[in-house]
Amino acid sequence: LWYFSEGLLGPLFAVFSEQIGGDVLDITAAWATYLIVSGLAYPLVGRVLNHSTWKFRMIAIGYALNTVFTFAYLLVSNTTELLLVQVGLGIAESISTPSWDAFFASKLRDTDDTFAWGIASGHTQFISGVAIAVGGLIAEFVSFRALFLVMGIISLMATIVQVRLSWMEEHAAV
């Protein structure tokens, strides 16, 4: 669900950026900001959570932050606000992804690890591809506002599922 929500925007990000007055440099700055923030925060979060018992919970926390900042797209009216949303999304990504990767890796058997990682990586590409197509239809035939609402709702659903899974994982261990 999370990858579908994120994938809905995809390359439409550039069109949205132009609609709020952005140019090529603004689009570049916004996307670079997201990548740099998440790239710098990944190892920091990984280090902090390395021996934590909260790894699985952090997936839900990252998803919840992602939901907040996805809905924040609805409030964006200029490129400065867009940059702030990108920072928030980068932080959310850096909290949830290393935690998910560590949890996933802990559940793998050595005999299936390469295949399992292939599925984990391949499904994100496939889901994002389908989502981009759907997102394009929503943006073209309805609006970016509708697209951001759909993205936020799907992200919220992913967060709820992850919170439930976190709760089940914690209580199964007891």
Identify the meaning behind each predicted range.
Residues 1-35:
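Helix-loop boundary and gating motifs at the non-cytosolic
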Residues 57-71, 152:
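Structural signature of the two symmetry-related core transmembrane helices
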Residues 80-96:
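Hydrophobic core of transmembrane alpha-helices in multi-pass small-molecule transporters
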Residues 95-108:
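Intracellular juxtamembrane helix-capping segments at the cytosolic ends
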Residues 137-155:
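A membrane-interface helix-boundary motif in multi-pass transporters
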Residues 35-43, 128-129:
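Residue-level signature of mid-helix packing/kink "hotspots" within the transmembrane helices
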Residues 41-54, 139:
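Helix-to-loop junctions at the C-terminal end of transmembrane segments
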Residues 24-25, 108-120:
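Loop-to-transmembrane helix entry/capping segments in MFS-fold secondary transporters
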